[in-house]
Design a protein with these regions (language model features):
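N-terminal secretory signal peptides that target proteins for export/translocation
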Residues: 1-5
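Bacterial N-terminal signal peptides
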Residues: 8-20
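N-terminal leader/targeting segments
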Residues: 7-8, 78
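Scaffold/interface architecture of coatomer-like assemblies
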Residues: 23-342
């Protein structure tokens, strides 16, 4: 069964009391931080005064502004079989929004800086697999480029922010190796928090588009989140964040049927956001998977356009990207929610 859905405002207030912050905020590529003291869990946010009943407004889509024009930004991966296609030009792409062709106003095939949230499942069932998962995540962090930034979050019965966004390799490695396995699985809470954290990361300049991605490792169904699947999926679709999900299937045959719900959730999150999903059965496959994700992130195109749709009704808009090169298959997020007048 799905975890019960919680209204967005209530979820935000509740999660403020269940997320443990064990690192200090750092700007990307800053000098190595001093070792911070271990912070106590944050107290719950105060209860807001009652308001008249009203339908909550959805959060706006995360769009990019250039010269006062609102742009829809896409991270596009193009493959031909098992190979990444990295030599396409702007004229090789066509973008359609709700069936109408759009005009590309920004195109870049050079690797843009990226903000990464790495989520590690540290529930009790990960006990024997955790050392290998740690080493794979450390190897992934070592592939960061100087302008990139990574945050480390682990989750069991609740998510814990072990290291806020930084390019400091030593701090990232320390955070990853500090994880231990115990408790249940608050998967939805962890994804919800990481999406909120990524919204805080700003581009270095007005001309830069900082890509965003979540790399999520979990070995089972959500069992203890306060936020429901539908709300997490909705928030993901309102972001410009690609989700790369690694679902570590149970090795025992009987456990694979129990994994079906987690498999569905991870597949949906990755598909809707233009990411990718992996389902290994052996933890020793993780280093190769992290390597594949790193290679994909380094092979993406950054493309943006100003929508020709003048309506500001907050409706869902479907995006289709095509290429003119035979055999080249593009992949990106499936759409976004249009702007509103509020």
């Amino acid at each position: 069964m799905w975890a019960p859905r919680v209204p967005a405002l209530f979820a935000s207030l509740v999660l403020a009391g269940v997320v443990t912050l064990t690192g200090q905020q750092q700007p990307p590529a800053s000098a190595p931080p001093q070792t911070p003291p271990v912070a106590a869990p944050q107290p719950p946010a105060p209860t807001p005064p009652p308001t008249p009943p009203a339908q909550p407004q959805p959060p706006p889509s995360s769009q990019v502004f250039r010269g006062g024009v609102e742009l829809v930004s896409l991270n596009v991966t193009v493959t031909d079989g098992t190979k990444y296609v990295t030599d396409l030009n702007q004229e090789d792409f066509e973008i359609y929004e709700d069936g109408a062709m759009q005009t590309i106003t920004l195109f870049n095939r050079e690797t843009q800086p990226i903000a990464l949230a790495v989520l590690l499942d540290t529930s009790a069932s990960m006990d024997e697999r955790l050392p290998t998962a740690q080493e794979a995540a450390v190897g992934f962090s070592r592939r960061l480029k100087p302008k990139d930034a990574m945050e480390v979050i682990d989750f069991n019965s609740q998510p814990h922010i072990l290291q806020t966004f930084t390019a400091d390799q030593a701090a990232l490695e320390k955070a990853i190796r500090s994880t231990t396995a115990n408790g249940s699985t608050a998967l939805y809470n962890a994804v919800y928090i990481s999406l909120k954290e990524l919204k805080k990361v700003k581009a270095a300049s007005a001309d830069e588009i900082r890509r965003q991605a979540i790399v999520l490792l979990s070995d089972g169904d959500d069992t203890s989140s306060l936020v429901g699947y539908e709300e997490v999926l909705d928030l993901a679709k309102r972001s410009e964040t690609s989700i790369y999900a690694i679902g570590l299937r149970p090795e025992r045959i009987g456990g694979r049927q129990e994994f079906k719900e987690a498999e569905f959730v991870l597949r949906q999150l990755s598909t809707e956001t233009g990411g990718r999903v992996f389902f290994p059965t052996n933890v020793n496959e993780l280093p190769k998977i992290y390597e594949q994700i790193s290679e994909e992130l380094a092979s993406q195109y950054t493309i943006a356009y100003a929508s020709k749709n003048p309506l500001r009704n907050g409706a869902w808009r479907r995006i289709i990207v095509r290429t003119k090169r035979p055999g080249a298959v593009p992949r990106t997020r499936q759409g976004y929610y249009g702007p509103t007048n509020r």
